[in-house]
Amino acid sequence: MSHDVTATKLTHEHVQRWLDDYAKAWDTYDGDDVRALFSRDAEYRWHPADDPEKGRETIVDAWLNPGGNASTRDVPGTYKADLRPFAVDGNRAVAVGTCTYWTDATRSKVERIYYNNWLLEFDDDGKCSSFTEYYMTPRKS
């Protein structure tokens, strides 16, 4: 999953590949898939005001064993991420999109939707060195 960006500038295409790899890691909950996303000293904020999870192995552990700042482990087949890069500047990117959750794996009834804004920073090897998640739910009618 490493996408070397040292020779070239970070692009929308690189960020989209990273987002696709993130969605795959979320689907698999495979430690190696998660590990491949982040730099050794990465920081991950589940919410903007949280103290970050610090270090790749701490991030992997938080994904695989939720608690604390991480919520719960999602049931396979009950969620889907639809994310895309919105802006890329230097080694920073903003991604936007939705994460949809269904009541069960049949995906017949939507339980909730989150609108996402992710602030991302990448190192020269194309790994995320800083991740901050902002999300909101639809307005109530």
Per-segment meaning from a language model:
Residues 1-40:
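Short, low-complexity N-terminal intrinsically disordered segments enriched in polar/charged residues
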Residues 17, 77-79, 112-114:
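Short solvent-exposed loop/turn micro-motifs enriched in small/polar/acidic residues
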Residues 97-99, 133-134:
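Short, well-ordered beta-to-alpha junction loops that form the rim of enzyme active sites
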Residues 99-101, 122:
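Hydrophobic beta-strand positions in extracellular immunoglobulin-like domains
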Residues 101-112:
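Short, cysteine-centered beta-strand-loop-beta hairpins and adjacent loop/turn segments enriched
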Residues 113-141:
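Short beta-strand edge/turn micro-motifs at domain boundaries
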